[in-house]
């Protein structure tokens, strides 16, 4: 085998209070092609993935080049970096004869990301609970639950968004967020999505990131007024998400109307329950 194509879904992480630990895979994809042989410079992300892969597997390094295409926008909080890292790692794994199982490839991706909340749903699909230590729990998400995203044209780099966060939190903020994250996990695990209503409130990261995303609260409020169960900042942003069981188009229109950015677009997605796929 000299080339392989790997499809990875977009992901939305945190879901409000589940900071660095909750995420869901979406039916929006990037496809990475990895080809044996010399080509253009790899770039930092692919080179770091390759160094980690060859180092961990002790596979004899080989030259390769790669490309990515698809619909996942960069630096909007939809896991674009995971689509590249998982794509390159799985591509190398296939070309090397599959020395790693899927879960181990996920672990390498999470190591490169620095947190597992996007890497887990990208790898396994569905809704994922991904603790810093311990096994990933993945749950199939039903077709009745829609995810509506308002995606601004401007990017927000994850590193910049993390620099906005405080070093410590009031105990009351941590308790509220932990309780809401547990409720979200329970609702997805049981499939009783009505119980998501009112559970997306967060005091760990969203209040601080809202300083550079002034439309965040108004967009979520508009989505909820139109019937959504709740909303959150997708990953580090800049996209904003709402979950709904009814009239997603109405929710999308409300979210778009509440945003004063002329270049933002609203889309409706369902969950991807497969995760990464080797297309070859």
Regions from the PLM with identified roles:
Residues 36-37, 152, 242-246:
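Short beta-strand-to-loop capping motifs
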Residues 188-280:
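Glycine-rich, charge-dense phosphate/pyrophosphate-binding loop(s)
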């Amino acid at each position: 085998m000299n080339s392989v194509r790997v499809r990875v879904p977009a992901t939305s992480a945190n879901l409000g209070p589940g900071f660095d630990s909750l995420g869901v895979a979406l039916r929006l994809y990037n496809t990475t092609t990895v080809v044996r042989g010399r080509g253009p410079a790899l770039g930092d992300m692919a080179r770091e993935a390759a160094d980690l892969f060859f180092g961990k597997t002790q596979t004899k390094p080989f030259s390769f080049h790669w490309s990515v295409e698809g619909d996942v926008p960069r630096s909007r909080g939809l896991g674009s970096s995971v689509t590249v890292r998982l794509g390159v790692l799985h591509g190398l794994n296939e070309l090397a004869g599959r020395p790693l199982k899927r879960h181990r490839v996920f672990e390498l991706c999470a190591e490169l990301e620095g947190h597992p909340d996007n890497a887990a749903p990208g790898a396994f699909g569905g809704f994922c609970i991904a603790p810093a230590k311990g096994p990933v729990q993945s749950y199939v998400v039903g077709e009745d639950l829609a995810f509506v995203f308002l995606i601004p044209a401007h990017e927000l780099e994850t590193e910049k968004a993390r620099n906005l966060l405080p070093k410590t939190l009031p105990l009351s903020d941590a308790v509220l967020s932990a309780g809401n994250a547990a409720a979200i996990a329970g609702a997805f695990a049981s499939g009783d999505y009505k119980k998501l209503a009112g559970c997306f409130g967060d005091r760990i990261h969203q209040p601080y990131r809202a300083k550079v995303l002034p439309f965040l609260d108004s967009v979520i409020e508009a989505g909820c007024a139109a019937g959504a169960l709740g909303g959150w900042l997708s990953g580090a942003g800049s996209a904003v998400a709402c979950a709904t069981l009814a009239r997603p188009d109405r929710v999308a229109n409300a979210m778009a109307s509440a945003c004063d950015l002329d270049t933002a677009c609203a889309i409706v997605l369902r969950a991807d329950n497969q995760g990464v796929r080797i297309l070859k």
